[in-house]
């Protein structure tokens, strides 16, 4: 058993122990609404808490059939955060979030964030999931994860939940314990594993193409916005330079006018002084006679 399988087994044992401990000490809490009634609306804080808890357990969800136990663990963690939600409510809310996220895949990131406020949180979970698969592919076998399990990792989460629950029911059916049927299923599983590997590779390639396309569109949008911003900034700078030139011209004109006015006043003052001096000289001559 390698380190990855050991970690996964340890995590399942912890979750099972936590589930049994909770059942032994905590009485069954009824759903906040009766069957058939509408679930109470989820708040933004409550939804973010659910996404965070579900993201922490995402790898375990992808590698185990006992999702019912995991949803009960999520429900208990939500109650610990003062959000009394039943496992079924958490599961339904997660399916709705996945559906909305998949509906935003063809949009630009900025538009998706405006229409779906939890886009970044969901994107982080799915990107991390794909990175794990890429790492498993590069290791040449997925660390003990079967081809069918890897294929389910990239199917929709709605299908994943139903498939895992059906697998649990089938494994408990006595009719399936027929050895001949088990041998036939194993032979069929070999071909399914090969097909699953091809399917996983196609999904990975499509995902990478989608990522490259999204990054290219984002880069083009960013460059267009940057170009528009630079053009507006250049236009604003040009207008400011024109206004500065106009201000300097007006100031120069005002100074010229002010100098002309002072020159005229000085000339008038000189003429006035000359006239007064001439008049005084005349009066002096007349008085002496």
Swiss-Prot record:
Residues 223-275 form a coiled coil. The keyword Transcription regulation applies. It is found in: Nucleus. A motif (Bipartite nuclear localization signal) lies at residues 65-81. One of its GO terms (molecular function) is DNA-binding transcription factor activity. Induction: By salt and infection with the bacterial pathogen P.syringae pv tomato. The lineage of its organism: Eukaryota, Viridiplantae, Streptophyta, Embryophyta, Tracheophyta. This is Trihelix transcription factor GT-3b. Residues 42-98 form the Myb-like domain. It comes from Arabidopsis thaliana. Residues 137-200 are annotated as: Disordered. One of its GO terms (biological process) is regulation of DNA-templated transcription. Residues 190-199 have a biased composition (Low complexity). A motif (Nuclear localization signal) lies at residues 179-188.
């Amino acid at each position: 058993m390698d380190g990855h399988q050991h970690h996964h087994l340890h995590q399942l044992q912890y979750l099972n122990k936590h589930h049994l401990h909770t059942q032994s000490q905590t009485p069954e809490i009824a759903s906040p609404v009766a069957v058939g009634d509408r679930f109470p609306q989820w708040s933004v804080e409550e939804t973010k808490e659910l996404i965070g808890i579900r993201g922490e357990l995402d790898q375990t969800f992808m590698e185990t059939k006992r999702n019912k136990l995991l949803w009960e663990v999520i429900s208990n963690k939500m109650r610990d955060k003062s959000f009394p939600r039943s496992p079924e409510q958490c599961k339904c809310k997660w399916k709705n979030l996945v559906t909305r996220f998949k509906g935003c895949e063809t949009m630009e990131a900025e538009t998706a964030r405006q229409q779906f406020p939890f886009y970044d949180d969901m994107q982080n979970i799915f990107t991390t999931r794909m990175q794990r698969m890429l790492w498993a592919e590069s290791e040449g076998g997925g660390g003990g994860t079967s081809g069918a399990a890897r294929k389910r990792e990239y199917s929709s989460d709605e299908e994943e939940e139903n498939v895992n629950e059906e697998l649990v029911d089938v494994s408990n059916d006595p009719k399936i314990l027929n050895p001949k049927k088990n041998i036939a299923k194993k032979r069929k599983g070999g071909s399914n594993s090969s097909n699953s590997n091809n399917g996983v590779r196609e999904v990975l390639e499509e995902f990478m193409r989608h990522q490259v396309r999204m990054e290219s569109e984002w880069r083009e949008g960013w460059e267009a916005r940057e170009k528009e911003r630079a053009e507006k900034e250049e236009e604003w700078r040009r207008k400011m330079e024109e206004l500065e030139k106009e201000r300097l011209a007006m100031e120069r004109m005002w100074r010229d006018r002010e100098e002309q006015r002072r020159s005229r006043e000085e000339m008038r003052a000189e003429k006035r002084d000359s006239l007064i001096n001439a008049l005084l000289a005349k009066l002096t001559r007349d008085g002496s006679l």
